[in-house]
Amino acid sequence: MAAPLLHTRLPGDAAASSSAVKKLGASRTGISNMRALENDFFNSPPRKTVRFGGTVTEVLLKYKKGETNDFELLKNQLLDPDIKDDQIINWLLEFRSSIMYLTKDFEQLISIILRLPWLNRSQTVVEEYLAFLGNLVSAQTVFLRPCLSMIASHFVPPRVIIKEGDVDVSDSDDEDDNLPANFDTCHRALQIIARYVPSTPWFLMPILVEKFPFVRKSERTLECYVHNLLRISVYFPTLRHEILELIIEKLLKLDVNASRQGIEDAEETATQTCGGTDSTEGLFNMDEDEETEHETKAGPERLDQMVHPVAERLDILMSLVLSYMKDVCYVDGKVDNGKTKDLYRDLINIFDKLLLPTHASCHVQFFMFYLCSFKLGFAEAFLEHLWKKLQDPSNPAIIRQAAGNYIGSFLARAKFIPLITVKSCLDLLVNWLHIYLNNQDSGTKAFCDVALHGPFYSACQAVFYTFVFRHKQLLSGNLKEGLQYLQSLNFERIVMSQLNPLKICLPSVVNFFAAITNKYQLVFCYTIIERNNRQMLPVIRSTAGGDSVQICTNPLDTFFPFDPCVLKRSKKFIDPIYQVWEDMSAEELQEFKKPMKKDIVEDEDDDFLKGEVPQNDTVIGITPSSFDTHFRSPSSSVGSPPVLYMQPSPL
């Protein structure tokens, strides 16, 4: 069982919400105690403790003259694995009285001192060691980096390696109950050093980058390190932007190696395995009561665990970041506008640098989704930021298209965005689309081409996708006024244009958009859809003989950034503010059912579509290539609307 770690800092319990302030207060108290200890140490004569006689100062001076025997003996005594607390205290007292002589010539000696096992020792050892660090960096700044590196190395659990001969039979995290206290001490050490050397944060950041564990290290190692980085950002606020950027960069590396499909497959396989009968079950359960009790205690933790190993790491770290964000932005249960605005500035810059250019990341972007839920103003600022990215022709097309993807997904999925904001965004997008079409009417590029008009198609899809998710709200209340508003958007001109967005946008989006607009007689898309489907398809010769037909069902390379979160811990932050697809009632489905046409386009090899085909041959069902029970990115498979490929009834 892992030792408790997060109760000292991160939110989740009542005591933790103001932990940052309390932690700083405790640190200041510790520093005051340190000053008193230092005065006592300096005012009291050093105790003679060197076993070989003389003082450390004399040994150092002899070494400079070429007499190295005592110096080698000194090093050997410091390297003694059985060194006692009193010995460490006495050595540190000696070194503090000789601090002016510990120049760069004694780098090897300082390295040995910095490797002393000072944590998990008596409080006197800890306080004396902290005082030594403060004296060392103030008198010999050349050793600042080694001191910071030593402290950063303690931000992860120590490794316990057990060998049998020359073979490592165990290499695991040491789950010491003192781990949280050791982390507290290390943070005190950093703050003490910073008091002596104000430029400490500037030297610290490269070390934190260097010491970041490899992303395939254990979940516990990554959790501890990220936890400690977030704590550093509290008392070194100048480092917050760089620390958050570092963490999110590492999260992205995990994210791109844990696709939704892979996570879902792993969970499904595990569920099927657990649901089956295990022939070996109970074979080695010597004490059934003990086993049952163990499973009961471990139950809640195991329910939150991800089967996919990379997803497990990602989920733990994502939940840490989301907890940290809430802890920073909320003061006494209320959003602090100033603190939230500062954090928003940091995160939007990181979003532009890391997230927007990254294609098909699954979960990391939810940090922006969560932050925007704190107050509507931040959601509107995020939308405005994305809108500027989309319409700015100086931005690369891939960035503009990504901005369109984010706008559509955010408007559709963010439960905290009111209808008036949705309508304002639709007005902006649709007006821009009409202006774009105006500029193409007399041009030579007025034809369907993703390479030429990628941002246009991305904006179209954002409009269609938002409309599909929000059409009930747009038409609720006064149906007549709702229809008048939708008619004012003039979808027909966009759909009928020579740029032919219905050919480029995802079939799942197009077909549901067509069904809804047909129902309310806003625009009739089926003629265009049929014409697009009848166009000549590329035929590729198969090496095994015969011809094969391949269709690109996602020419826009679309993904929906805010598809449902499937990380179990992180979902708890997102679900309350997340708009899931509401399944249609039987009556609503009946309204959409149309006679089936026999010439529906065959399967289009797209793993976006995994829905069940209705068995009723008289009703148009799901074309396997265009829909599934989950209206999501092409790489996804769960969590959204069933999309029926509908054709108008024959006259």
From Swiss-Prot:
GO molecular function: RNA polymerase I core binding; RNA polymerase I core promoter sequence-specific DNA binding; RNA polymerase I general transcription initiation factor activity
Interaction with EIF3L: annotated span: 557-651
PTM remark: Phosphorylation is required for participation in rDNA transcription. Phosphorylated at Thr-200 by MAPK9/JNK2, which abrogates initiation complex formation.
Subcellular location: Nucleus, Nucleolus
Region (Disordered), start-end ranges: 624-651
A Pfam family of this chain: RRN3
Keywords: Nucleus, Phosphoprotein, Transcription, Transcription regulation
GO biological process: cytoplasm organization; fibroblast proliferation; homeostasis of number of cells; in utero embryonic development; intrinsic apoptotic signaling pathway by p53 class mediator; negative regulation of intrinsic apoptotic signaling pathway by p53 class mediator; nucleolus organization; positive regulation of DNA-templated transcription
Region Interaction with POLR1F, annotated ranges: 500-651
Modified sites of kind Phosphoserine: 170, 172, 640
Cellular component aspect of the GO annotation: nucleolus; nucleoplasm; nucleus
Chain positions with Phosphothreonine modification: 200
Compositionally biased spans, kind Low complexity: 633-643
Domain of life of the native organism: Eukaryota
Family recorded in the similarity comment: Belongs to the RRN3 family.
Functional note: Required for efficient transcription initiation by RNA polymerase I (Pol I). Required for the formation of the competent pre-initiation complex (PIC).
Assembly with partners or alone: Part of Pol I pre-initiation complex (PIC), in which Pol I core assembles with RRN3 and promoter-bound UTBF and SL1/TIF-IB complex. Interacts with POLR1F, EIF3L, TAF1B and TAF1C.
Protein name, as recorded: RNA polymerase I-specific transcription initiation factor RRN3
Organism field: Homo sapiens
